[in-house]
Amino acid sequence: MSEAKNREMFEKALEAIADGQEYLALTYIDQASTMENEPLYLSSKALCVAKVRRSFKEAIYLCRDALEFEPTNPVHHLNLGKIYLLAGQKKKALSTFYDGLKHGRNPSILSEMEKLGVRKSPFFSFLARRHPLNKYSGILLSKFGLR
């Protein structure tokens, strides 16, 4: 298959992923197999493998390979975080999302974190979150738009 045809298949796969059609995306990705050394290909394939085949170890391995090639690309962090969520590893997913935000404010990462209900850190970090000082200072500061 020519390079242009592989690129076209991969573009179709990315569109299918965006539409939530992982089965179709995995089919396109498998057809574009000569792109196996490209990080975005690895990362996208990893997400599809996790969603379709439920093979989380393989998916995590593929996505980590993509991160080795491009550690500063937040899309790879997003995909790895989604894989961790599918595998039921919420703490690792959040950690991965935070790592991705260090490399750029990706709206998709922020959206995933919002779905998870990530809370802001307490105003007084040395006190418990439930402590009245933390509770009411947080409410007050958010009313004034300072938090």
List PLM regions with ranges.
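Long, contiguous interaction/recruitment modules in multidomain scaffold/adaptor proteins
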Residues: M1-K5, G20, I139-R147
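Alpha-helical solenoid repeat scaffolds
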Residues: F10-E11, L80
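Alpha-helical adaptor scaffolds
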Residues: E11-A18, Y23, T27-V75
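Canonical tetratricopeptide repeat
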Residues: S44-A46, N79, E112-M113
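Amphipathic alpha-helical segments within well-ordered protein domains
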Residues: L47, R64, G81, F97-Y98
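Mid-chain, well-packed structural core segment of small domains
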Residues: A66-K91
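TPR/TPR-like (Sel1-like) alpha-helical repeat modules
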Residues: L85-K135
